[in-house]
Amino acid sequence: MQQHRPVRRALLSVSDKAGILEFAQALSQRGVELLSTGGTARLLADAGLPVTEVSDYTGFPEMMDGRVKTLHPKVHGGILGRRGQDDAIMTEHGISPIDMVVVNLYPFAQTVSRADCSLEDAVENIDIGGPTMVRSAAKNHKDVAIVVKSSDYQAIIAELDANECSLTLATRFDLAIKAFEHTAAYDSMIANYFGSMVPAYHGETTEPAGRFPRTLNLNFIKKQDMRYGENSHQQAAFYIEEHVGEASVATAQQVQGKALSYNNIADTDAALECVKEFDQPACVIVKHANPCGVATGSAIIEAYERAYQTDPTSAFGGIIAFNRELDEATARAIISRQFVEVIIAPSASDAALKITAAKQNVRVLTCGQWQQRQTGLDFKRVNGGLLVQDRDLGMVSDSQLRVVSKRQPSEQELRDALFCWKVAKFVKSNAIVYARDNMTIGIGAGQMSRVYSAKIAAIKAADEGLEVTGSSMASDAFFPFRDGIDAAAAVGITCVIQPGGSIRDDEVIAAADEHGIAMIFTGMRHFRH
């Protein structure tokens, strides 16, 4: 089998035109004949490149508003023809070999993500000719190179220069893998979208209804292999979505430190998603996926100092997230005070990075600033299945709160209640959070009994000498009994925020009134398992 195949003719037809002009220029300069279609052909011609329209090459015009462009034997014969085996039949029918196909597909995902997308819009953004060419070229990778990612353009030109304008079989095989991954992901998106449209077309059916598709097809790209998973006997890797428009641990850039571990990534995600809830400069410290200290301040150094006070013991070896740039003063405070696994922030100043560089094992990530949190899906694997739900982006506004106690909360109590309510959303259930002056003073996480979470929060505050009297308390779900309120009153809590909805709400409210506690119902639960 010939390892190298020369590239003499290339067909270029792309929706995402980033880098295509420079790539086409590089190919043309190396003597490669260019075929192209539609907007891509116009772009190349306008730049003065010698390019042949596919319709001129086939002798058959584009038609049906561009629906039929490349579906022609001269195109697919040129791609699928096996060199040395199909040469005679290709010559007989005037089919020239096509050595490289450069294609990316109609922007279906971007189209259906628009709020105003109609079914007709979605249908017109289903690419037919593109995937057909991609699959044809990938199938015949022994002879043809298929390029679906602009990130490969530079490396391909470098290899052409190193190998007298030819590509190795290994490269063509790698490109074919990417091509099949590309079309599989594309078809999955279309199947998911159409599967979600079943109720609109059929009304009552025996199929499971709702907005989720009947068959869920997921496509993630491997970002890195890991030394091990949650435990050392488990193998692991990190996969990310191809199109992530929101600042996240998946899109973050690591600017310092050793490779992220499985647990690092999980904990960093928890910290970053929590700190996104706050508008003021904020710091979240996480250990084992639970916040152990959260605070806001006039600047992030103040936020860090206050968050650290909540639980210095648990902060050791933790993850620290900020919603502002990591500055020199904050970096110095962290490095001089504690062992930290990961620091993540929208950005980091050069001065801050000089400080963290003194501890080379500290992982520093920058994720960019976020504007708005995007809707999406959360997944939980169970044995033999997958639970799917919307991301929990719910958060109550002041107007949605309902005071159910006799006593109204003060302005300070209300601010603290809303603060700890945001934190409770990110604490494992059963979750109890004590807060005062926009700073957590005690967090009780993951207990099977809600009252024990309340007791743990009180113990945490007492251990650090933090004053509880006059503080607010948040509970991620309703209190099934009054004992949680009694426990809160015993340590000086004066305001409680919770969803409400228990059959014993009257007893719980009565307990609050007995203790002179202001109680607020949100009407929204935030279980986290």
Swiss-Prot record:
EC number: 2.1.2.3, 3.5.4.10
Keyword terms, alphabetized: Hydrolase, Multifunctional enzyme, Purine biosynthesis, Transferase
Reactions mediated catalytically: (6R)-10-formyltetrahydrofolate + 5-amino-1-(5-phospho-beta-D-ribosyl)imidazole-4-carboxamide = 5-formamido-1-(5-phospho-D-ribosyl)imidazole-4-carboxamide + (6S)-5,6,7,8-tetrahydrofolate; IMP + H2O = 5-formamido-1-(5-phospho-D-ribosyl)imidazole-4-carboxamide
Gene Ontology CC: cytosol
Sequence similarity: Belongs to the PurH family.
Domain of life according to the entry: Bacteria
Statement: the UniProt record of this protein carries the keyword Hydrolase: yes
Gene Ontology terms for molecular function: IMP cyclohydrolase activity; phosphoribosylaminoimidazolecarboxamide formyltransferase activity
Single GO biological process annotation from the record: 'de novo' IMP biosynthetic process
Gene: purH
InterPro entries: AICAR_Tfase_dup_dom_sf, Cytidine_deaminase-like, MGS-like_dom, MGS-like_dom_sf, PurH-like
Residue intervals of the MGS-like domain: 1-148
Domain text: The IMP cyclohydrolase activity resides in the N-terminal region.
Pathway the protein takes part in: Purine metabolism; IMP biosynthesis via de novo pathway; 5-formamido-1-(5-phospho-D-ribosyl)imidazole-4-carboxamide from 5-amino-1-(5-phospho-D-ribosyl)imidazole-4-carboxamide (10-formyl THF route): step 1/1; Purine metabolism; IMP biosynthesis via de novo pathway; IMP from 5-formamido-1-(5-phospho-D-ribosyl)imidazole-4-carboxamide: step 1/1
Record's protein name: Bifunctional purine biosynthesis protein PurH
Source organism of the structure: Erwinia tasmaniensis (strain DSM 17950 / CFBP 7177 / CIP 109463 / NCPPB 4357 / Et1/99)
